[in-house]
Design a protein with these regions (language model features):
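Aromatic-rich peripheral "rim/lid" segments of glycoside hydrolase catalytic domains that contact
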Residues: 143, 160, 165, 173, ...
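Bacterial N-terminal signal peptides
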Residues: 7-17
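Edge beta-strands of extracellular beta-sandwich domains
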Residues: 458-468
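Boundary/entry segment of secreted carbohydrate-active catalytic domains
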Residues: 24-58, 62-64
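Noncatalytic carbohydrate-binding groove/subsite architecture in carbohydrate-active enzymes
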Residues: 41-45, 131-145, 150-152, 173-309
């Protein structure tokens, strides 16, 4: 290893390239969405430290196009056009990377100059404008520019089955039109994101857990998530996406995570039905699911909410439901701390900064499913399987091409079976490929500890589990 010092790798999105993961939901990205606290609060650095200490591995954030580009850029595809106002996003992405966390950016909200002077929930009059913005944003965080970390995950719009975020939901005859409009919006945003950052992963949907499918006087228009997804697939069955995102909140807010709701509304318990339906409608098997918002609001801030003790009981139940579903790859809790900047009371901290009982449950629930310590499968009898690892903290102080060295130790049933050393190079998306030199026996399960290092002293540790397929 020459001058390379000891380092343990932050493993994100690890995959054996020769065989798919056998039980993807054994690991999930778990984290928080709380822009008022984690992005804008004066104490945001301390808040992010606290989130990292709870074993959070991802932070979700909104990039509201209307705020990022209040006036039309001279060159909309340029990630650094002077019209773009993204300093706070830059800071969050850097701060998250420094703490080993991934970022999910959800793009939504049309500027007035792009939709005829309407509010942000109306689609652009020309989808090319959205495509160019999405391309500029993803290129900015493509890992190609020093000081602007790679962002791996993107979502397109927010709760598009609600008029609050996407209007209109119905036409003058009362027919549902939002899915058809969203199909165009999603296609444009997906194309832009992939043009700017081909290695990024993009989710569509981002649907709310419930809707009415008909107009009701004095109530905001909404479409149920099941109906929305079905009509979306009808509008464009070949729509491209890497995952489908959903917000399976309990509704009403006092429901348990295990509560079934009437289809086509979709709760945590009914996610499998949505998944089967998505496979049928889009004619695609095993569509990954991202839970990009979930939470339980507590009393007294939410009079109809649950007690803090109930929230603490429900949190691990919700995670367990998600974990049992092999398609679920992400679980984001909304919010981290109750605050004046949010109307939600679902935080794991109270407004005064004291802990709710649910915080301890999160801190104990998150580590076993940490996606940085992945669980994979490889073909039985295969030697030196390729393993792709992301090394997020290394990127905080090192650029593309940096030499990354490591010592690995493979164990079978606790017995050391292989010790080896590898040196490889860092890619722009904060990933490396390693080939631990041992043969994966059929039916055996190996635990491999990686201790990675760089010349500038970065040191991390992650553990990878590899199961050999076939019978031993």
């Amino acid at each position: 290893m020459s001058a390379l010092t000891r380092l343990i790798l932050v493993v994100s999105l690890v995959a054996v390239t020769t065989a798919p993961a056998a039980h993807a939901a054994e690991r999930m990205w778990m984290g928080f969405h709380d822009d008022p606290v984690l992005r804008w609060d004066a104490g945001r650095i301390d808040e992010l430290d606290a989130a990292a200490q709870t074993n959070a591995t991802i932070v979700r954030t909104f990039v509201t196009w209307a705020n990022a580009a209040p006036r039309r850029p001279a060159n909309p595809s340029n990630p650094f056009d002077p019209a773009y106002m993204l300093d706070d996003v830059d800071e969050l992405v850097r701060n998250a990377q420094n703490r080993g966390m991934e970022v999910l950016i959800t793009i939504w909200g049309t500027p007035r100059w792009a939709n005829g002077g309407r509010t942000p929930n109306y689609v652009p009059t020309n989808m090319t404008e959205l495509r160019r913005f999405a391309q500029a944003l993803s290129a900015r965080y493509s890992g190609r520019y020093p000081g602007y970390p790679f962002v791996r995950f993107y979502g397109i719009w927010n709760e598009s089955n609600l008029a609050r975020f996407l209007a209109p939901q119905f036409d003058a005859r009362g027919e549902i039109v939002a899915p058809r409009n969203y199909a165009k919006l999603a296609a444009a945003a997906y194309a832009g994101i992939k043009a700017g950052s081909p290695r990024s992963l993009v989710a569509i949907g981002e649907t709310s857990s419930h809707g009415r499918d008909k107009q009701v006087p004095k109530l905001s228009d909404s479409t149920s998530p099941g109906t929305f997804a079905r009509l979306l697939a009808e509008a464009n069955p070949r729509l491209q996406f890497d995952a489908y995102a959903h917000h399976p909140y309990p509704y009403p807010v006092f429901f348990k995570p295990t509560q079934l709701v009437r289809w086509p509304n979709v709760s945590l318990k009914s996610l499998p039905r949505l998944e089967r339906s998505l496979s049928t409608w889009f004619r695609r098997d095993n569509i990954p699911i991202w839970i990009t918002e979930y939470g339980h609001e507590t009393k007294p801030g939410e009079p109809l909410g649950v007690t803090e003790a109930q929230q603490a009981d429900y949190l691990p139940q919700a995670v367990a439901l998600a974990k049992r579903d092999r398609r679920v790859e992400m679980f984001v809790w909304f919010v981290f701390r109750d605050s004046l900047g949010s109307s939600w009371q679902s935080g794991l901290y109270r407004r005064n900064g004291t802990r709710k009982p649910a915080l301890a449950r999160w801190a104990s629930t998150a580590p076993p499913v940490d996606a940085r310590n992945p669980s994979l499968s490889a073909r039985g009898g295969q030697r030196a399987p390729d393993v792709n690892l992301t090394t997020r903290e290394i990127c905080a102080t090192n650029g593309e091409g940096t030499a990354v060295g490591m010592t690995y130790r493979a164990r079978l049933a606790g017995k050391l079976v292989k010790v080896g050393q590898i040196q490889t190079r860092l890619r722009s998306d904060c990933s490396i490929t390693v080939r631990p030199a041992f043969t994966v026996a059929p039916g055996k399960r190996y635990v491999i500890q990686f201790d990675l290092n760089t010349e500038n002293g970065v040191s991390l540790r992650r553990t990878v589990t590899i199961a050999g397929s076939g019978r031993g």
